[in-house]
A protein has these predicted regions:
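Electropositive
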Residues: 69, 73-105
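C-terminal motif of bacterial Sec signal peptides marking the signal peptidase cleavage site
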Residues: 38-40
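Basic polycationic patches enriched in arginine
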Residues: 11-12, 22-24
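A structural motif detector for short, solvent-exposed N-terminal "entry" segments of globular domains
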Residues: 42-80
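Short, low-complexity intrinsically disordered segments enriched in A/P/G/S/L with frequent Arg
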Residues: 16, 25-28
Length: 224
């Protein structure tokens, strides 16, 4: 079988060579388009917000560029502090927001294994204690909390709102549905989360000496 040839600029060019060149150019263009698409999908890390959780106070403070903008009541573990698997304890130290789940879902939406069950639970429903409304999944950044992501340590909504301010969880940080929705909408992936066994006044810049506002207006009420 004789190969077809073409003449370009006085040179003898084999047809198969032209086809191969076109395929390589097409592949390169496809690769560039794919890289551009993937780059557009990357969510910038949230370096603006900082969440500080005080186990001592059972409160969560949200800072925007180191300025306090909100304080919410929370519940940490009834079993105390720690990070070993199966301990049901709340880890200490520096963590970050790894994933956010449940955006747009109505308050009280029940999640099991981070998947909606289709059930809704009202606040303080008798005998019910599922994960509801929003999930903010945390990843540890230090040896003392290296297991946090694998242990499914979340900031999440709880129907047991009457117990907020008390350590009653199984390791996660619980919030009311309304509060976790607000937090979810403000913080992004990669935002710093610090969990401490100390009062907020010792760790929030300026809170102790009054340069930060110690009480934040939230939904018509003050959170102290």
């Amino acid at each position: 079988m004789t190969k077809k040839t073409k003449y370009a600029g006085g040179r003898r060019v084999v047809g198969a060579q032209i086809l191969g060149t076109r395929q390589r150019v097409s592949l390169q263009l496809t690769s560039l388009a794919l890289l551009s698409f993937l780059a557009s999908c990357v969510t910038p890390k949230d370096v603006q917000h900082h969440v500080i959780i005080s186990v001592k106070d059972q409160k969560l403070a949200l800072l925007d560029r180191e300025t306090l903008i909100a304080i919410y009541p929370v519940s940490t573990s009834k079993y105390g502090l720690g990070d070993w698997r199966g301990s049901f304890r709340t880890p200490l130290g520096e963590l970050e927001i790894a994933q956010k789940i449940g955006g747009g879902m109505p308050p009280g939406t029940v999640f099991k294994d981070r998947i909606r069950t289709g059930e809704m639970v009202l606040p303080n429903a008798a005998g019910r204690d599922p994960i509801v409304t929003r999930i903010i999944w945390l990843r540890g950044r230090e040896p003392q909390n290296a297991n946090a992501f694998g242990r499914d340590i979340y900031i999440h909504g709880t129907p047991e709102e009457r117990n907020l301010g008390l350590p009653v969880s199984y390791g996660c940080v619980r919030m009311s549905s309304n509060d976790v929705i607000k937090l979810y909408e403000m913080v992004g992936l990669g935002a710093q989360v610090t969990i401490v066994d100390a009062p907020l006044v010792e760790v929030v810049p300026g809170l102790a000496n009054g340069t930060q506002v110690a009480s934040i207006r939230r939904g018509g009420t003050f959170v102290h």
